[in-house]
């Protein structure tokens, strides 16, 4: 029957953790995207690093195989929403950074759509089960929203925020005062 597969971490930390420039850059990204810890940032960096490595390895392939695999990789990244255009090149993939990935997190998109007042409130709404994608509750702020799912993000049907979104509640309190 065999032993179960050992689960390993999906992220790789920095090679040298105490470089001031990197620490400051990490703090800015953690604040901008409302991340809970640096591990979430390192996960994004690792995923982008793997996509860039794939693109570099495609450059060494013969032209026939390279073109088909290149199209597949570009289509995947386009569906994920990480690259903006469907006719991108390997240079566009090599130019990706962790911000391209962090922009596709559910937490960021909920905030940018205006469903939450702050990026931190967006995280709280997701964790507490107030956000749904296509009517299906999603409670993970790190969920990567595909390009086709972006328009389906809304409040969960039974959520009290469905009738009174956070932005409207704040406006009502100001008008009463």
From Swiss-Prot:
GO MF annotation: an example: structural constituent of ribosome
Record SUPFAM superfamilies: Alpha-L RNA-binding motif (SSF55174)
Alphabetized UniProt keyword annotations: Ribonucleoprotein, Ribosomal protein, RNA-binding, rRNA-binding
Pfam families: Ribosomal_S4, S4
CDD domains: S4
UniProt keyword Zinc, yes or no: no
Region of interest (Disordered), residue spans: 158-177
Entry keyword annotation includes Ribosomal protein: yes
Residue ranges annotated for the S4 RNA-binding domain, each copy included: 104-166
Residues annotated as signal peptide: none
Residue ranges with Polar residues bias: 165-177
Gene Ontology BP terms: ribosomal small subunit biogenesis; translation
GO CC term (a single one): small ribosomal subunit
Superkingdom of origin organism: Archaea
Stated family: Belongs to the universal ribosomal protein uS4 family.
Subunit text: Part of the 30S ribosomal subunit. Contacts protein S5. The interaction surface between S4 and S5 is involved in control of translational fidelity.
HAMAP family per the UniProt record, alphabetical: Ribosomal_uS4_A
Stated role: One of the primary rRNA binding proteins, it binds directly to 16S rRNA where it nucleates assembly of the body of the 30S subunit.
Protein name, UniProt field: Small ribosomal subunit protein uS4
Organism of this sequence: Sulfurisphaera tokodaii (strain DSM 16993 / JCM 10545 / NBRC 100140 / 7)
Lineage: Archaea, Thermoproteota, Thermoprotei, Sulfolobales, Sulfolobaceae
Gene assigned in the entry: rps4
